Regions:
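Extended, well-ordered protein cores
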Residues: 2-270, 278-504, 508-618
């Protein structure tokens, strides 16, 4: 990328965005070329990343470059311009399907070892872990997030409002979340006084020390956490909520993020499935274990694997699963016509998309009969789920939002350098034995943070870099100055991590000229209430949030304001000086692909690409 010829790198990804790219990218090049702008493509699809990871298994002419690693390198250069389209954050079933498809095309990549038995299997699984989940975003997002609805898009939504379901004060829809034993209640935080190198280790009750992560390099001023979720508390919570939904006659739905949180949330998802179907699973445990059934991958894993059984045995298992529903609540459906439930696959119901859709529909989801119904929305982790309950309370009191008059809620998100939980995948572990989980300084042996944990608990260590926090505060002030909008930092005083963040935000705001700006810091629930009260008055409010709330709110408000999150302008000013421009905040729209196959019609809206291209050319 020389100064003589500006270059835009346009990513090739997956599903609907990739199909749209075949039509749109040639047009971009046709207009860019006479202007002296070079437009290069870079394939970071799931398939390309699998092939790059296992190039040693391929013939010479089948090998592809590691484009993701190269893009990661380019984010550190000051003149980089990347247009990034949505890509699949592959769940295990999606990853396994991609592997099978590649093998059928003649690529000798290894099978995905769901249950590794040998060291070789474990090594292969570790390599596939680099491709699964949100493997792309932590590499490319070397800056914080600026997401907003462009004025023209907002005005169009006001003049041509999308459909919105009616809210009733009698709605029984509510969020169910853990009151103890989750990450929120099991969190400790520390602001580092100096640069350190630490390890994560488990001291078992039997006296053995297991090093789970031998080395994590940390800088002065970085914030680290030790947080865990109790398996016992989680399963107890599920049983209580399933029983409550059955007794009260309300539909049951589970909302997690098993794609992005690729280590922790498939486990959280799987425990719910196992508790729900515990009678059938207990009866057939031996054969299900022999088949290697893993419902962390959804009920689809069970149905696929029992296909290998004799017909009568298979039918008995299916009948026993169906019999469970006689004393369990109705399940929310992903596809009522095809009988696909909330438990089919962990990637089917993703909290940041499913909760806004439910709220837009008047607090309802679809049941088995194809009708919309009130639901118990189970969000196990309470850290962020309370904001949804606050919005539900607001809607029950004030009614549905009006797209023709409501204000807008842009977001400035703390995202750079794999901030917070979204960067913790390589530091997240399912505890193998009861013991004490410690974060230890490698040089001094000092235990920085410690937790008592039990077998099956999920323990993780998020890291938030001081430089990323400074840049986030700067971006929030800049957006306040440019837009004239009020900014609210959503930071709880009761959560240890956010208490540390509040201190830094207050300190770093002093580095900027904030005269004439309205900048506030509020706990999450207060911030939601304050923002909603302004929204219904047509007032605009920038939400400055951490990484998970960035993800949640940049779906929640656009879906209510615009009908979709795909029409957002999503800019990532890279900390090295370049820019990454994400095309909206939506996903890769697999249903669009299904419709294309069935009807030969692609309904993908490329407005996000146009917006990103415009910002990139500027």
């Amino acid at each position: 990328m020389s100064a003589e010829q500006p270059t835009i790198i346009y990513t090739l990804t997956d599903e609907a965005p990739l199909l749209a790219t075949y039509a749109f990218l040639p047009i971009i090049r046709t207009f860019a070329d006479p202007a002296g702008i070079n437009v290069e493509s870079s394939d970071i699809s799931v398939a390309a990343r699998i092939l790059a990871e296992f190039s040693d298994c391929l013939d010479e002419d089948q090998r592809v470059p590691d484009n993701l690693a190269e893009l990661g390198r380019l984010t550190q250069l000051p003149d980089t311009n990347i247009i990034k389209l949505p890509n699949i954050s592959a769940s295990v079933p999606q990853l396994a399907a991609a592997v099978k498809e590649l093998q059928e095309k003649g690529y000798a990549v290894p099978d995905y070892p769901a249950h590794p038995k040998t060291d070789e299997d474990k090594a292969v699984k570790e390599r596939y872990a680099k491709v699964s989940g949100s493997a792309v975003n932590p590499v490319l997002r070397e800056g914080n997030s600026d997401r907003r609805a462009p004025k023209s898009v907002k005005e169009y939504a006001r003049n041509h409002p999308h459909s919105m379901g009616e809210w009733s004060q009698a709605s029984r829809t509510h969020v169910a979340t853990m009151k103890d034993g989750d990450f929120y209640h099991g969190e400790k935080s520390m602001n580092l006084d100096r640069a350190r190198e630490v390890r994560m280790e488990l001291k078992t009750k039997g006296g053995k020390t297991i090093v789970l992560k031998p080395e994590v390099k940390l800088g002065e001023g970085d914030i680290i956490e030790s947080m865990f979720m109790s398996k016992k508390a989680l399963c107890r919570f599920y049983e209580e909520q399933i029983e409550d939904a059955y007794k009260t006659g309300v539909m049951f739905s589970l909302h997690v993020k098993a794609t992005m949180m690729k280590v922790s949330h498939p486990i959280v998802f799987g425990h719910c499935v196992k508790v729900f179907y515990k009678d059938a699973f207990a009866k057939h445990q031996k054969v299900l274990d022999e088949l290697g059934v893993n419902v962390n991958n959804g009920m689809v894993d069970l149905y696929k694997k029992i296909e290998a059984l004799p017909g009568s045995q298979r039918e008995e298992i299916v009948q026993d699963i169906h019999a469970v529903h006689e004393h369990r609540p109705e399940l929310a459906m992903v596809d009522s016509a095809r009988g696909i439930t909330n438990f089919h696959s962990p990637s089917d119901v993703i909290v940041d998309a499913s909760m806004p859709a439910m709220i837009r529909l008047g607090g309802k989801m679809y049941g088995a009969d194809g009708r919309t119904k009130d639901t118990k929305a189970v969000n196990p982790e309470s850290t962020f789920s309370r904001i949804y309950q606050e919005m539900i309370n607001f809607c029950k009191t004030h009614g549905q939002f009006d797209p023709t008059t409501m204000g807008t809620v842009p977001n400035v998100g703390l995202m750079a350098q794999a901030a917070e939980e979204y960067g913790s995948h390589d530091k997240t572990f399912e505890i193998p034995q009861d013991g004490v989980a410690d974060i230890v300084d490698n040089d001094t042996g000092e235990v920085l943070l410690t937790q008592e944990v039990e077998e099956g608990d999920i323990w993780r260590m998020p890291v938030t870099k001081d430089a990323a926090i400074r840049d986030w505060v700067k971006l929030a002030v800049n957006r306040a100055r440019e837009s004239g909008m009020t900014v609210v930092f959503w930071l709880d005083t009761e959560r240890p991590h956010e208490a540390e963040l509040r201190k830094k935000v207050k300190a770093y705001l002093k580095d900027h000229d904030t005269e004439g700006l309205t900048i506030q810091i509020m706990p999450q629930v207060w911030a939601m209430r304050y923002t909603l009260e302004r929204v219904v008055r047509g007032q605009d409010t920038i939400a400055a949030t951490g990484n998970i709330l960035r993800d949640y709110l940049t779906d929640l408000f656009p879906i209510l304001e615009l009908g979709t999150s795909a029409k957002m302008l999503s800019i990532v000013p890279l900390m090295a000086g370049g820019g990454m421009y994400e095309t909206g905040a939506g996903g890769s729209a697999p249903k669009h692909v299904k419709q294309l196959v069935e009807e030969n019609h692609l309904r993908w809206d490329s407005l996000g690409e146009y917006l990103a291209l415009g910002a990139c050319l500027e």
